[in-house]
Amino acid sequence: MKKKIKLLVATLSFSTVFFYCQSTPTTYDMTGYVVDTKVNSSGEVTVLVDGRGIETEQMLISDYGWAHISDNTDIYLNGKKVDSYPFTIDPSVVVYVTYDGLVAESYPVQGGAKTIFIED
C-alpha cells in the first residue's frame, strides 16, 4: 500500500512539474514573430505579431495583430514566468498571445494581452 501511495505522489509531482514547465501553451489566440513594437508615454509596450507563415492546428483569432502588454500581462520565457522581457524584432523568437477580453476586429486585430509565451 505504501508503495502505491509513493508511486501516486511521484506521478502527480512529475505531472505537475511537466505541466508548469512547458514552453508552449496548450491554448492561445495568436502565434508568430514580433515584427514591430511601440512604447507609449507610460512605458507600456505593444507588439505586432505576424504569424501568417506559421501553420498550426489550433483555431486562432488571427494570424496578424497587435498585443498590448500591461502590468496585468503574464509573461513566460521558455516556460518560466518573468517580470519583463525586452521585446525586439527577431525572426527567431516565437511568441504565443492570449488576449484578455475583447479584441478590435480590425486587421490587424488589436487587444490587451493576458498572457504571452516566448520561445527564445
What are these regions (language model features)?
Residues 4-6, 19-59, 80-120:
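Short, flexible, surface-exposed loop segments at domain boundaries
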Residues 61-83:
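Beta-strand/loop nucleic-acid-binding surfaces
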